[in-house]
């Protein structure tokens, strides 16, 4: 099973949108497991206290209860994720274009959305 580390933006989109190919993603790239870093959960908890993102953050925190979590320390999720890719490589799920470029430059793979479909970028 391939673990896919989710950042905050990807997780919010995954939990608040209808994803067209969610059932077929496993057959396209092998069986995957979305993993939520503890630092992402911390970001979501902070967002749940803001007026603008409150409802999306609460919905996403509830959604994340059904996903595997992993301990990842750091003040900011992007920094922790970049450090993880630097040490271990892997697939990172994000919508953040700056983070995507950094992950790719370090040899990691990126999963994202296109037209509400999950895609693996090259």
Predicted regions, residues:
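Nuclease catalytic cores that cleave nucleic-acid phosphodiester bonds
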Residues: 39-122
């Amino acid at each position: 099973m391939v673990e896919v580390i989710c950042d905050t933006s990807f997780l919010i989109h995954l939990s608040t949108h209808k994803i067209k190919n969610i059932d077929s993603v496993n057959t396209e790239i092998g069986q995957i497991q979305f993993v939520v870093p503890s630092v992402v959960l911390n970001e979501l908890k902070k967002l749940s206290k803001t007026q603008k993102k409150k409802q999306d953050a609460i919905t996403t925190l509830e959604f994340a209860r059904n996903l595997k979590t992993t301990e990842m320390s750091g003040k900011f999720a992007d920094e922790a994720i970049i450090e993880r890719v630097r040490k271990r490589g892997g697939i990172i799920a994000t919508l953040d274009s700056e983070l995507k470029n950094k992950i790719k430059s370090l040899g990691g793979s990126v999963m994202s959305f296109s037209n509400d479909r999950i895609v693996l970028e090259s």
